[in-house]
């Protein structure tokens, strides 16, 4: 038997179902349409129109759903559509009912309908039967250790057992309370004198103790050998100025100097009897005419021709003022009637026909300062009158301080000669002079350090 194609089989089934549905006897046997719609037969009977051939409807694409359940007078929407098709007016006359045909094959199951709304909650049912006991569970973990129970009554003493092996030594017990003091025992006999022990090693030197008071003067000892020569002592304070010595013999006369300039003639004095007597100072004269300013630019240094002279064209004029360092630079200048200032001597010179002549023999000092207080001269490295020394540096720890020789008591520690001077210890303290001590050092009148005030920690 040949197997049909599924598509061909589907077409045959649709044609078969359509032929069955077209017969009203089969439909009436399956579904009582007449009972549900009583006016349908009357409509068909009252219609006496011409009869025509009934063409079967086209087969549906899908087979009709299979009806399950009890027959109900209420029809589904698909059945209503089918009844409307049958209720349509037909020109053919309905014949007599034929015999019922054989039941058709069971159709395929229909698609499930949509879920209806959820119903109301029903009443509580009866309790079910008790289920079987389940398998035993896993044993639980052990619980915490409980509190110890009350101590029971002491039992009776048992029989003496066999002596066992000696056990290990137990822990040392706590120290007991001191016992009562016993009575003093009798004095024992003196033992024999033991042999003399060997001499021990010398111990470590102890800490430096405090200086004790001066003890009584002891007896004079035997003259010892002469010790080595010590280092020279500290320099003493500056002594008082001694008496002036006897004047020495006069020295040899020096070479004759250059002749000085001839001074202006003085006023005629009063006649005298062979002796010159200086008269009294006269009154102050009237002020002279005001001077004139020479403000014109110089034409030439060696031959000046600027400005009008105050006292006529015949008076000499100073063309320029030069600043030189020493005598060599001064001799190189050939400008007549010029003034030069020497830095090494701090003095002025004037150029004359005879050469350079000094104007000031001593340096110039500010007004109000004494000659010995020439502070601007000290430290230039040149020894000048009024200075004991001049090393040209501001160091106060050497032998020359402020152009005076250092001495013990000037307040400055002379490096390499003095240990201290006043409060100048050279950055020394008790902590650095005597390690491990504290306090303040003291300077003696001989410029040496006294460490008596230093104390050690005890």
From Swiss-Prot:
It comes from the Eukaryota. Keywords: Collagen, Disulfide bond, Neurotransmitter degradation, Repeat, Signal, Synapse. Residues 129-132, 234-237 are annotated as: Heparan sulfate proteoglycan binding. This is Acetylcholinesterase collagenic tail peptide. It comes from Rattus norvegicus. GO terms for molecular function: extracellular matrix structural constituent conferring tensile strength; heparin binding; structural molecule activity. Residues 117-126, 181-199 have a biased composition (Basic and acidic residues). Expressed in skeletal muscle, heart, brain, as well as in lung, spleen, testis, but not liver. The short isoform represents about 5% of the transcripts in the soleus muscle and about 15% in the heart ventricle. Anchors the catalytic subunits of asymmetric AChE to the synaptic basal lamina. Residues 100-111, 133-151, 262-271 have a biased composition (Pro residues). GO terms for cellular component: basement membrane; collagen trimer; collagen-containing extracellular matrix; extracellular space; neuromuscular junction; plasma membrane. InterPro entries: Collagen, Collagen_superfamily, Myxo_disulph_rpt. Residues 1-22 form the signal peptide.
């Amino acid at each position: 038997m040949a197997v049909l194609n599924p598509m061909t089989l589907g077409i045959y089934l649709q044609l078969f179902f359509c032929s069955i549905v077209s017969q009203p006897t089969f439909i009436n046997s399956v579904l009582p349409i007449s009972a549900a719609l009583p006016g349908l037969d009357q409509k068909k009977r009252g219609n006496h129109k011409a009869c025509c051939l009934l063409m079967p409807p086209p087969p549906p694409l899908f087979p009709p759903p299979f009806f399950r359940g009890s027959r109900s007078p209420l029809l589904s929407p698909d059945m209503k559509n089918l009844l409307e098709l049958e209720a349509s007016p037909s020109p053919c006359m309905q014949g007599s009912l034929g015999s019922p045909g054989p039941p058709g094959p069971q159709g395929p199951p229909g698609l499930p309908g949509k879920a209806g709304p959820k119903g109301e909650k029903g009443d509580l049912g009866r309790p079910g039967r008790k289920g079987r006991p389940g398998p035993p569970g896993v044993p639980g973990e052990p619980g915490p250790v409980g509190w110890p129970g009350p101590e029971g009554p002491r039992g009776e003493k048992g029989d003496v057992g066999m002596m066992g092996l000696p056990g290990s030594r137990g822990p040392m017990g706590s120290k007991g309370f001191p016992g009562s003091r016993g009575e003093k025992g009798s004095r024992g006999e003196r033992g024999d004198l033991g042999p003399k022990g060997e001499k021990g090693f010398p111990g470590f030197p102890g800490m430096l103790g405090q200086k004790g008071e001066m003890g009584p003067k002891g007896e004079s000892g035997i003259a010892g050998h002469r010790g080595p020569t010590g280092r020279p002592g500290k320099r003493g304070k500056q002594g008082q100025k001694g008496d002036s010595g006897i004047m020495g013999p006069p020295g040899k006369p020096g070479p004759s100097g250059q002749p000085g300039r001839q001074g202006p003639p003085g006023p005629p004095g009063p006649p005298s009897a062979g002796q010159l007597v200086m008269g009294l100072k006269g009154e102050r004269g009237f002020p002279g005419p005001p001077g004139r300013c020479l403000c014109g630019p110089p034409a030439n240094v060696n031959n000046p021709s600027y400005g009008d002279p105050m006292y006529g064209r015949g008076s000499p004029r100073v063309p320029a003022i030069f600043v030189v360092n020493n005598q060599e630079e001064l001799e190189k200048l050939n400008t007549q009637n010029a003034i030069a200032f020497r830095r090494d001597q701090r003095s002025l010179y004037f150029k004359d026909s005879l050469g350079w002549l000094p104007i000031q023999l001593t340096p110039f000092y500010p007004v109000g300062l004494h000659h010995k207080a020439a502070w601007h001269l000290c430290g230039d490295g040149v020894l000048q009158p009024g200075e004991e020394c001049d090393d040209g540096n501001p160091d106060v720890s050497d032998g020359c301080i402020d152009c005076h020789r250092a001495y013990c008591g000037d307040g400055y520690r002379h490096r390499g000669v003095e240990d201290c001077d006043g409060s100048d210890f050279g950055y020394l303290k008790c902590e650095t002079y005597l390690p491990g001590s504290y306090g303040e050092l003291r300077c003696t009148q001989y410029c040496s350090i006294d460490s008596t005030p230093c104390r050690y920690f005890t």
